[in-house]
Protein backbone atom coordinates (compact mmCIF):
# COMPACT_ATOMS: atom_id res chain seq x y z
CA UNK A 1 0.00 0.00 0.00
CA UNK A 2 1.26 3.47 -0.88
CA UNK A 3 0.98 6.60 1.26
CA UNK A 4 -2.33 8.31 0.53
CA UNK A 5 -3.29 11.97 1.10
CA UNK A 6 -6.99 12.71 1.44
CA UNK A 7 -8.93 15.93 1.99
CA UNK A 8 -11.21 15.46 4.99
CA UNK A 9 -12.72 18.96 4.98
CA UNK A 10 -12.21 22.12 2.96
CA UNK A 11 -13.74 25.57 2.67
CA UNK A 12 -12.44 29.00 1.62
CA UNK A 13 -10.33 29.42 4.78
CA UNK A 14 -9.15 26.00 5.89
CA UNK A 15 -8.09 22.68 4.44
CA UNK A 16 -7.93 19.57 6.67
CA UNK A 17 -5.72 16.93 5.03
CA UNK A 18 -4.90 13.48 6.24
CA UNK A 19 -1.98 11.26 5.26
CA UNK A 20 -2.41 7.51 5.65
CA UNK A 21 1.17 6.30 6.00
CA UNK A 22 1.83 2.88 4.55
CA UNK A 23 3.55 0.20 6.53
CA UNK A 24 2.96 1.83 9.91
CA UNK A 25 -0.83 2.24 9.96
CA UNK A 26 -0.91 5.80 11.29
CA UNK A 27 -2.65 9.01 10.27
CA UNK A 28 -0.92 12.39 10.03
CA UNK A 29 -3.20 15.42 10.12
CA UNK A 30 -2.41 18.62 8.20
CA UNK A 31 -4.26 21.86 8.76
CA UNK A 32 -3.70 24.59 6.19
CA UNK A 33 -5.23 27.97 7.01
CA UNK A 34 -5.56 30.94 4.67
CA UNK A 35 -3.38 33.78 6.07
CA UNK A 36 -5.47 36.35 7.93
CA UNK A 37 -8.51 34.08 8.10
CA UNK A 38 -8.15 32.98 11.71
CA UNK A 39 -10.45 34.04 14.59
CA UNK A 40 -11.92 32.58 17.77
CA UNK A 41 -15.20 31.92 15.96
CA UNK A 42 -13.43 30.06 13.18
CA UNK A 43 -11.48 28.00 15.72
CA UNK A 44 -14.75 26.95 17.35
CA UNK A 45 -16.19 26.01 13.96
CA UNK A 46 -13.15 23.97 12.90
CA UNK A 47 -12.72 22.37 16.32
CA UNK A 48 -16.33 21.21 16.07
CA UNK A 49 -15.69 19.80 12.58
CA UNK A 50 -12.60 18.00 13.91
CA UNK A 51 -14.43 16.50 16.91
CA UNK A 52 -17.79 15.77 15.28
CA UNK A 53 -16.75 14.69 11.78
CA UNK A 54 -13.05 13.98 11.36
CA UNK A 55 -12.46 11.98 14.56
CA UNK A 56 -15.50 9.70 13.98
CA UNK A 57 -14.43 9.27 10.34
CA UNK A 58 -10.97 8.09 11.44
CA UNK A 59 -12.31 5.93 14.28
CA UNK A 60 -14.61 4.17 11.81
CA UNK A 61 -11.46 3.21 9.88
CA UNK A 62 -9.89 1.75 13.05
CA UNK A 63 -7.40 4.54 13.73
CA UNK A 64 -6.96 5.38 17.40
CA UNK A 65 -4.29 8.08 17.17
CA UNK A 66 -3.76 11.21 15.09
CA UNK A 67 -0.31 12.71 14.57
CA UNK A 68 1.00 16.13 13.53
CA UNK A 69 4.53 17.40 12.95
CA UNK A 70 4.82 21.20 13.01
CA UNK A 71 8.22 22.79 12.56
CA UNK A 72 10.20 23.38 15.76
CA UNK A 73 10.41 27.13 15.11
CA UNK A 74 6.68 27.54 14.31
CA UNK A 75 5.31 28.26 17.78
CA UNK A 76 1.93 29.44 16.40
CA UNK A 77 1.37 26.12 14.63
CA UNK A 78 2.29 24.19 17.77
CA UNK A 79 -0.16 26.23 19.86
CA UNK A 80 -2.90 25.74 17.28
CA UNK A 81 -2.37 21.98 17.17
CA UNK A 82 -2.48 21.86 20.99
CA UNK A 83 -5.87 23.60 20.82
CA UNK A 84 -7.12 20.56 18.89
CA UNK A 85 -5.98 18.32 21.76
CA UNK A 86 -2.69 17.01 20.41
CA UNK A 87 0.29 16.98 22.77
CA UNK A 88 4.02 16.94 22.19
CA UNK A 89 5.82 13.66 22.70
CA UNK A 90 9.17 14.31 21.05
CA UNK A 91 11.28 16.15 18.50
CA UNK A 92 13.09 14.93 15.40
CA UNK A 93 14.97 16.66 12.58
CA UNK A 94 13.52 20.12 13.23
CA UNK A 95 9.96 18.87 13.76
CA UNK A 96 7.87 18.69 16.92
CA UNK A 97 6.14 15.31 17.15
CA UNK A 98 2.56 15.62 18.43
CA UNK A 99 -0.28 13.15 18.82
CA UNK A 100 -3.76 12.65 20.18
CA UNK A 101 -5.48 9.41 21.10
CA UNK A 102 -8.97 9.32 19.64
Please give the residue ranges for each predicted region.
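A conserved beta-strand-loop-helix scaffold within acyl/acetyltransferase catalytic domains
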Residues: 14-26
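Conserved beta-hairpin
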Residues: 3-17
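Low-complexity, intrinsically disordered Gly/Pro/Thr-rich segments
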Residues: 15, 76-89
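Conserved acetyl-CoA binding element of GNAT-fold acetyltransferases
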Residues: 24-40, 96
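Conserved acetyl-CoA-binding loop-helix of GNAT-fold acetyltransferases
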Residues: 40-57, 79, 83
Amino acid sequence: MEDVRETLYQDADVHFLCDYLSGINIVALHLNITPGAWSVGKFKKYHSIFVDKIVPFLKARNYNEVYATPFENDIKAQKLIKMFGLHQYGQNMGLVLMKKEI
